[in-house]
């Protein structure tokens, strides 16, 4: 069997959220969108119910449009590549307005052990708490985060920050182990405090676009503290 490309995603579920965007771009229904003109756009708020049908099926297209609306508000270009390759996850938790994300892997080089990723979070949205373990393919992932639009609350191991615990969505607040919070504004950089540490982030009230720098990311080393969370 052929080895996957070093840039390939290693979970089929990450590809599902890209399918409609790729189909639209391939069909010529979307050209690359330039940054929107400057305006005082209103921040939209969402309920998790907005992203599921009556049977509880996650509505990826509605989630995608919510991110696109945020991109336009932030004057962030919606390129052809982004339309084709952005993936969207609710982590199987059925609480997408509060726990979920979108993203794109710009590169993931096992051969040279480096990784580039953009993280997209709606207002108040959280990535589930997780850690990265060593695998047969590489060492535990190390990472740093730099907000480009909006701001984030990064949570990691260490002395708890009681006045910011309320930023954690209620559905995850009693599950997480990481209670030391460091807010990051535009172009501030935060780091994972040690290899294999538990960590997560929560977007501020406007949402967030975050550049992540890291070492090679093998999905087989990803672990969630919430036993219900999955890719």
Give the residues covered by each predicted segment.
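Glycine- and acidic-residue-biased ligand/ion/polar-headgroup-sensing regions
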Residues: 122, 140-160
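A short, N-terminal "cap"/entry segment at the start of jelly-roll beta-barrel domains
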Residues: 34-115, 171-174, 228-230
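A short hydrophobic beta-strand segment most commonly corresponding to one strand
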Residues: 144, 200, 205-224
């Amino acid at each position: 069997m052929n080895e996957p490309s070093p840039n390939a995603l290693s979970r089929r579920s990450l590809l599902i959220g890209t399918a409609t965007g790729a189909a639209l771009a391939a069909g010529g229904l979307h050209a690359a969108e330039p940054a929107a003109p400057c305006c005082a756009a209103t921040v939209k708020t969402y309920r998790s119910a907005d992203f599921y049908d009556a049977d509880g099926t996650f509505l990826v297209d509605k989630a995608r449009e919510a991110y696109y609306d945020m991109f336009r508000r932030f004057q962030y270009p919606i390129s052809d590549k982004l339309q084709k390759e952005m993936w969207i996850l609710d982590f199987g938790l059925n609480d997408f307005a509060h726990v979920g994300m979108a993203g794109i892997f710009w590169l993931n080089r096992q051969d040279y052990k480096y990784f580039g990723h953009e993280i997209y979070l709606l207002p108040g949205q959280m990535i589930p708490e997780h850690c990265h373990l060593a695998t047969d393919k590489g060492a535990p992932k190390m990472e740093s985060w730099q907000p480009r639009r909006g701001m984030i609350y990064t949570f990691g191991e260490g002395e708890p920050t009681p006045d910011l615990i309320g930023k954690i969505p209620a559905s995850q607040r009693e599950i997480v182990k990481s209670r030391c919070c460091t807010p990051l504004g535009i172009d501030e950089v935060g780091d994972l405090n040690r290899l294999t540490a538990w960590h997560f982030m929560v977007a501020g009230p406007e949402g967030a676009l975050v550049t992540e720098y890291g070492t090679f990311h093998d999905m087989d080393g990803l672990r969630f503290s919430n036993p219900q969370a999955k890719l």
